[in-house]
């Protein structure tokens, strides 16, 4: 899959673009841990604290994040995406409309060459943190929307004493992303446990995250067991996570992970748009729905912490595909090649009078 950087025009200057929207970018999230409710553009401190802090994990170009911020001026929306160019464009979107309750994380200043590093360093444009009425839309009311049921505050997490479970291979629990050699200059990873204090988040949103269908990349999914365990201490009392995706296999996989991580499902839907028609759109969601995608959704809150954490679910998303692939009206994003290969194989088996191939559960 091409990165955002690979699609940039020849004259694109990250440094110049960064300087124009740096007030909405935070390059040292750890400096704000425990006091995000006081953040203001440019890394200044606001007078009145935000009522909630919401993390949009995998925010892309920020259309959804900024739209939510416009609807809920009393809530701070913190966005993070693995691609620094997407983060830049999200900050530009926030700057363009002038919202003061949206900020986008970069784990340090990304490297795009000497021109970029020099431009950012000389400008000093790094938000590192020195010392209207809410919409009546059903979509974003934190009290009754599946986005969140949060009522807690910092330090009020039911799992405040938990140590995030680390993945044996990469120790990435609570890491937002892991990517090697990102051409876009994106950070290799970000450790959410250093960016947010215990119980600081009122909600954690995951909108159309990358599904990583292959078994060997399952640990990169935002709803992987180790990551879900890492989110628990960061969620305040009554807070939860919400997933929206076009992928039924990812939704079903996520249900297994939530159960293993001790979360309680508070809401699920096979068509989120029917239940929440006024919810903000992102360009990515519009693209998928125009292709025939239905939006699946889950909301969950941490329940009692499991005594023993063990991965027992099938990890390949192929294991969550329906038996009859010919009845699949929409193929989830990222699985088109796999489904086409399986359909072709089944067609050949039928032509030979043989039983159709069914991939093993792995």
List the predicted regions and their residue ranges:
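S-adenosyl-L-methionine
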Residues: 94-120, 179-198
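Conserved S-adenosyl-L-methionine
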Residues: 58
């Amino acid at each position: 899959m091409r990165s955002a950087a690979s699609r940039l025009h020849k004259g694109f200057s990250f440094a110049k673009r960064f300087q124009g929207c740096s007030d909405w970018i935070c390059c040292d999230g750890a400096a704000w841990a425990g006091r995000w409710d006081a953040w203001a553009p440019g890394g200044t401190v606001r007078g009145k604290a935000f009522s909630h802090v919401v993390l949009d994990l995998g925010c892309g170009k920020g259309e959804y994040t900024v739209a939510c911020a416009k609807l809920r001026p009393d809530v701070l929306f913190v966005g993070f995406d693995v691609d620094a160019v997407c983060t830049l464009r999200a900050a530009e979107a926030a700057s363009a409309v002038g919202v003061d309750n949206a900020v986008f994380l970069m784990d340090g200043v990304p490297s795009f060459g000497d021109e970029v590093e020099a431009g950012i360093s000389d400008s000093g444009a790094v938000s590192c943190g020195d010392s209207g009425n809410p919409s009546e839309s059903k979509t974003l009311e934190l009290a009754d929307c599946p986005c969140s049921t949060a009522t807690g505050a910092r330090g009020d997490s039911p799992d405040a004493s938990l140590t995030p479970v680390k993945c044996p291979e990469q120790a990435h629990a609570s890491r937002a992303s892991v990517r090697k050699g990102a051409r876009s200059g994106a950070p290799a990873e970000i450790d959410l446990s250093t960016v947010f204090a215990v119980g600081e988040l009122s909600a954690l949103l995951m909108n159309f995250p990358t599904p990583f269908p292959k078994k060997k990349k399952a640990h990169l999914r935002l709803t992987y067991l180790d990551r879900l365990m890492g989110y628990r201490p960061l969620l305040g009392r009554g807070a939860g996570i919400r997933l929206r995706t076009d992928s039924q296999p990812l939704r079903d996989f996520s249900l297994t992970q939530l159960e293993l991580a001790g979360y309680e499902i508070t809401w699920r839907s096979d068509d989120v748009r029917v239940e929440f028609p006024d919810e903000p759109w992102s360009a990515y969601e519009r693209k998928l729905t125009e292709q025939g995608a239905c939006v699946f959704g889950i909301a969950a809150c941490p329940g009692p912490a499991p005594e023993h954490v063990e991965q027992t679910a099938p990890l390949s998303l192929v294991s969550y595909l329906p038996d009859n692939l010919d009845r699949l009206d929409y193929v989830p994003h990222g699985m088109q090649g796999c489904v086409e290969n399986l359909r072709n194989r089944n067609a050949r088996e039928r032509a030979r009078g043989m039983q159709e191939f069914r991939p093993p559960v792995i």
